[in-house]
Amino acid sequence: MKQGIHPDYHEVVFMDSATGYKFLSGSTKNSEETIEWEDGNTYPLIRVEISSDSHPFYTGRQKFTQADGRVDRFNKKYGFTN
């Protein structure tokens, strides 16, 4: 790799603000706030609003919208049956 053109990649702790879930990962983000991790080391803490622990798609609490309503209206209008 060329020297001096790549961002600093280091380990940080991401914390889901909604659930308090924390995980250690690599990132180029940095923060003034730090936290001591389970291994005893101190890492920068990045707070996120949504993670895999709170996102409805990953938790199984997903709500479906009326996207299929348009198909049902089309089928009803033209007399198609499922």
Swiss-Prot record:
InterPro entries: Ribosomal_bL28/bL31-like_sf, Ribosomal_bL31, Ribosomal_bL31_B, Ribosomal_bL31_sf
Entry annotated with the keyword Thylakoid: no
Record's keyword terms, sorted: Ribonucleoprotein, Ribosomal protein
Gene Ontology CC annotations of this record: ribonucleoprotein complex; ribosome
UniProt GO MF annotations: structural constituent of ribosome
Any one GO BP annotation for this protein: translation
Annotated NCBIfam families: L31, PRK01678.1
Annotated HAMAP family: Ribosomal_bL31_2 (MF_00502)
Subunit structure, interactors included: Part of the 50S ribosomal subunit.
Family: Belongs to the bacterial ribosomal protein bL31 family. Type B subfamily.
Protein name per its UniProtKB record: Large ribosomal subunit protein bL31B
Lineage of the organism: Bacteria, Bacillati, Bacillota, Bacilli, Lactobacillales
Gene (UniProt): rpmE2
